[in-house]
């Protein structure tokens, strides 16, 4: 991010810095600065490496896709100075607007390219057959309060790609490699 995009990367306690909870990353467009919450720092918290990588790629996505839009707003220079509020704030509980959805998609494609995902899927599963995960997902839902249940195969692949299990689960479902819901019965099959 620093060399490829010319951005400065910092780690900080974003809840304290910005006075709000659950902030994972923030971008200051004018100063070309990306700040990731220190709770995600992989050397201090190895279990958060996947979340750190995805958050960093997500913020890079904002820079690549949205910096020009935000920089074109006349008030931006005075409104969003490094000493005040960031141009973009990303929260873990935030409802996804189009910019957040686009940055998530950018991060997903960057960290989990389709050809590499399909190649590794083939390697560990012996082919490209879809995994019918609805029974495993129902069992996970019964034991967990997480909004997106993560299957074991998604966890295994997440470790290989160094992303979070949740990010991998979403990507695998998007590529139709994991079927999360049981299909409706077809009247004409059988």
Model-derived segments and their meaning:
Residues 1-190:
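Active-site hotspot residues in diverse enzymes, especially metal/ion-binding acidic/histidine motifs
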